[in-house]
Amino acid sequence: WLPIFKANCIAPLLLTQLLYRNFLLGNQKKIVFISSKPASITENTGGSMYMSRSSRSALNQVIKSLSVDLIKEGISVASISPGWVKTDSGGINALIDVHTSVTGIKKIINELRLENTGKFWDYNGELIPW
């Protein structure tokens, strides 16, 4: 469990801390994290997936806190779920192809502003409740 928590939650925060000064220098000050819809506490009606759900839920808490802390620096922060994507890890039953996921993620990043910082987005542009 700890290796998954380190990869999904701790490493993204440490990387953000290491790159913080770089974010301040950017023209478009945006930090985007890839989470997953199963990390939503509100949307959890299926149970199971304890390691993945809990580590990504913890990441979402980090993301929300960063959005509050960094807004004064003009940095927008978002959590994005790429959807269930047809990849080696997503498997053949996944619902969307890579192009659909990436196109949606790119659109969300392009539209990310301080006004909508601290949100949890699905790849299709819909908000996911925390």
How should these model regions be labeled?
Residues 1-6, 10-14, 20-71:
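Catalytic loop of short-chain dehydrogenase/reductase
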Residues 16, 87, 117:
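Ser/Thr-centric signal marking residues that sit
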Residues 27-36, 80-89, 110:
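A short, hydrophobic/aromatic-rich structural module that often spans a beta strand
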Residues 39-41, 68, 72-96:
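Flexible, glycine-rich beta-alpha linker
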Residues 79-82, 91-130:
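C-terminal helical subdomain
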